[in-house]
């Protein structure tokens, strides 16, 4: 039995694979303006977010301190979103061409942690808490809209409108406006957690839903565009390549691995801003 559980890939190995793919993707993201970075970097990078999502599902399910787990993800996501907000509204620290990073995957994960906890409360028949947690995430955008409709003068007050914009961008983000991942990523995260424990069903449903969201729906919309050819689904609309991550997920052996958990948390913001800073310097040299 021990030999069987040791076969495949553990959590650390999956995260390492995802990390390498993420770096390739972000090299393309930040240095695409040079025209020297192959698109295949971005294509390979499509697998990184699903793998990190899968690992986060497992991490949340196994952690002994969910509150600390959540706060760590929330804090990193909030800090990165606050800097993004500053870049958007103060137009500070932007690259010479106006570009600034829109990397907010930790905010997606933060919202998902709340929903996952809600799912567990429902399983424990704590219906009020479970429904409340899930409803808080789902209904928050509508609460904001209702608030702005009831108090339209807020949008005409510079300070008040800025505060509201900051709140819904950084500490209390809305699932409908996060700049990274998108609704299909969030839906995939809910499915992975809700179906956890039935690996084949879990990954089959996830792969089918993501294929529908990232291939079938974009293909249907792209077909309406003049000049579109189906091969563009492999050259331009390749977000659906992330479905291939299911093959690596199937190899997960249920083991956490050797650790390095702090590395994976802090590497994300560190490499984003290092690559962004390098791209700003290179842009200034080349312009």
Locate predicted features.
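Alpha-helical transmembrane segments and their immediate juxtamembrane cytosolic regions
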Residues: 1-287
């Amino acid at each position: 039995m021990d030999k069987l559980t040791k076969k495949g890939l553990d959590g650390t190995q999956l995260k390492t694979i995802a990390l390498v793919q993420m770096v390739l993707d972000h090299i393309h993201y930040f240095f695409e303006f040079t025209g020297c970075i192959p698109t295949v970097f971005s294509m390979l990078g499509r697998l990184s977010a699903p793998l990190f999502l899968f690992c986060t599902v497992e991490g949340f399910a196994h952690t002994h301190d969910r509150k600390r787990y959540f706060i760590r993800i929330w804090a990193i996501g909030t800090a990165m979103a606050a800097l993004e907000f500053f870049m958007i509204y103060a137009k500070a620290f932007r690259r010479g061409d106006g570009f600034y990073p829109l990397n907010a995957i930790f905010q997606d994960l933060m919202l998902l942690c709340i929903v996952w906890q809600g799912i567990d409360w429902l399983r424990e028949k704590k219906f009020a808490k479970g429904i409340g947690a899930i409803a808080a995430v789902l209904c928050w955008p509508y609460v904001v809209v209702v608030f702005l409709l009831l108090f339209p003068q807020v949008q005409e007050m510079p300070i008040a409108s800025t505060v509201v914009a900051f709140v819904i961008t950084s500490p209390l983000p809305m699932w409908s406006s996060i700049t990274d991942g998108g609704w299909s990523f969030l839906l995939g995260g809910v499915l992975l957690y809700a179906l956890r424990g039935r690996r084949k069903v879990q990954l089959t449903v996830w792969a089918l839903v993501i294929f529908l969201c990232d291939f079938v729906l974009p293909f249907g919309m792209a077909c309406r565009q003049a000049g579109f050819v189906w091969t563009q689904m492999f050259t331009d609309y390749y977000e659906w390549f992330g479905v291939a991550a299911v093959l690596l997920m199937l190899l997960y052996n249920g083991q956490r691995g050797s650790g390095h958990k702090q590395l994976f948390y802090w590497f994300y913001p560190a490499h984003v801003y290092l690559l962004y800073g390098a791209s700003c310097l290179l842009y200034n040299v080349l312009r």
